């Protein structure tokens, strides 16, 4: 009985010890979570944090609207104001030509920023992600029958988006620097998802209200917001350069 009591006592002590370790581990995880969220909002002066959040939420707002409607525009019938592409034509335009343009734009954007830094290429990238949206104004106005013209227009828009999106991704990395960088980058990507979701909620309603042509005109006008939020972000001139990153 004595041996059994001691054995039960040892088991109880181990259970209490294990529970204490688990509780301590949970407290440590919770503490780090709170600190990572707190430092995410306080890692810069309040004004710069606000500007950073506005940049992350609104830099891609026009693209958030365009992305939801452009695909529908390509396949919708001419009687509804669309280009009336067949499924095969649409697959080639978006799945081949568009992807090639997007990939090439992203590669060249990364090469440019790696050579000269994000700050130097910010404005060219802002122009690249906004001005090519004009091709959809042209397409919805001219309604071209030429499949080649449609492909060229989609390529231009996707290439510009790939090039301009580089600035956005690099800024997320820039803001995430410092302690808890992995957690901060995860929070930045949450804002990135929100930046596309919010415009998408109203894109369809707006298109039905004004039609394709005026919808794309509104998208181009809203590109002013992208220029505004980009004008106020503060970026280290050395950030993004390959040599600077290697030293880090």
Give, region by region, the residue ranges found by the protein language model:
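Loop-to-transmembrane helix entry/capping segments in MFS-fold secondary transporters
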Residues: 87-88, 178-188
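Multi-pass alpha-helical transporter architecture, strongest
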Residues: 13-16, 217-247
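Single conserved hydrophobic/aromatic residue that forms the stacking wall/gate
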Residues: 1-12
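Helix-to-loop junctions at the C-terminal end of transmembrane segments
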Residues: 104-119, 207-208
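A membrane-interface helix-boundary motif in multi-pass transporters
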Residues: 5-6, 205-223
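Juxtamembrane intracellular "pre-TM" segments in multi-pass secondary transporters
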Residues: 18-51
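C-terminal transmembrane helical hairpin of 12-TM major facilitator-type secondary transporters
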Residues: 120-168
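Short amphipathic helix-loop junctions that connect adjacent transmembrane helices
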Residues: 59, 68-90
């Amino acid at each position: 009985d004595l041996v059994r009591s001691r054995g039960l006592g040892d088991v109880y002590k181990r259970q209490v010890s294990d529970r204490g370790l688990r509780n301590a581990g949970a407290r440590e995880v919770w503490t780090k979570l709170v600190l990572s969220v707190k430092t995410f909002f306080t890692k810069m002066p309040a004004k710069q944090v606000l500007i950073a959040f506005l940049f992350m939420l609104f830099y891609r707002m026009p693209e958030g609207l365009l992305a939801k409607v452009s695909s529908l525009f390509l396949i919708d019938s001419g009687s509804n104001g669309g280009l009336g592409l067949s499924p095969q034509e649409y697959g080639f335009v978006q799945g081949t030509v568009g992807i090639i343009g997007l990939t090439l734009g992203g590669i060249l954007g990364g090469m440019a920023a790696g050579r000269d830094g994000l700050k130097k290429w910010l404005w060219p990238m802002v122009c690249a992600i906004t001005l090519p949206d004009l091709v959809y104004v042209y397409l919805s106005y001219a309604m071209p029958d030429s499949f080649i013209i449609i492909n060229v227009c989609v390529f231009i828009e996707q290439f510009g988006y790939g090039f301009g999106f580089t600035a956005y991704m690099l800024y997320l990395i820039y803001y995430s620097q410092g302690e808890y960088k992995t957690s901060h980058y995860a929070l930045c990507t949450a804002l990135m998802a929100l930046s596309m979701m919010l415009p998408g909620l109203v894109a369809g309603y707006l298109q039905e209200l004004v039609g394709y042509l005026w919808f794309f005109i509104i998208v181009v006008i809203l590109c002013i917001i992208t220029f505004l939020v980009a004008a106020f972000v503060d970026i280290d001139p050395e950030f993004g350069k390959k040599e600077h990153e290697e030293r880090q």
